[in-house]
Each structure stands twice: as structure tokens, then as C-alpha cells.
């Protein structure tokens, strides 16, 4: 699984994240984790389910939110893409206060 091999990189990106959605390509879906998952869920009006993941090497639960690549393609037309690779996208979005994420 993506998190097993890239968890440190993903969580490092999410640590201070307040206005970016980091998306990772998984087959026909794009997955967002932690704060990116929260932002994506708010942006898409909960079109998908949020999954809570637990890893033995990470002390906190990690949120995961997945969308079909067609839905993400629509989002890319409406939002600024900061980075685009075949298996990684970064979208700019509105700023979130850390307090609103932790609730």
C-alpha cells in the first residue's frame, strides 16, 4: 500500500499543510491523507467516505479520502494546480485554521 512505503513523505507534507491538497494516484482513484483529506472532503461536499487508518508505527489516526480520477479531473479545471505528475497532484485551495481541522 502507498502509505506503507511513503508514510513519512506523506505525513511530512501534511504536518504544516493549511492550503494544499496533496493527491496520490492509486489505480483509477486519487487518495488524499490527513489535512488534504479534510480539505478535499470539504471541497467535494462529502461525495465519498472518509476512512480512518491506524498504523503501528504512527501514533495518531490518519484520515484518507479517495475520489475517482474523473472527479479529480473536474477539480483540476476549477482550482490552481501547483504540481502535476502521473501519480501525484497538488492543488491550491482556501486556507484552513488548524483549530477547524482538529475538531
Set out the residue ranges of the language-model regions:
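Basic, polar low-complexity surface loops/patches
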Residues: 1-103
Amino acid at each position: 500500500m502507498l502509505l506503507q512505503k511513503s508514510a513519512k513523505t506523506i505525513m511530512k507534507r501534511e504536518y504544516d499543510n493549511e492550503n494544499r491538497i496533496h493527491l496520490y494516484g492509486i489505480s483509477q482513484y486519487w487518495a488524499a491523507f490527513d489535512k488534504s483529506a479534510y480539505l478535499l472532503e470539504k471541497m467535494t461536499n462529502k461525495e465519498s467516505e472518509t476512512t480512518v487508518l491506524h498504523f503501528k508505527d504512527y501514533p495518531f489516526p490518519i484520515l484518507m479520502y479517495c475520489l475517482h480520477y474523473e472527479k479529480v479531473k473536474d477539480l483540476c479545471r476549477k482550482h490552481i494546480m501547483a504540481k502535476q505528475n502521473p501519480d501525484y497532484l497538488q492543488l491550491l485551495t482556501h486556507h484552513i485554521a488548524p483549530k477547524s481541522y482538529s475538531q
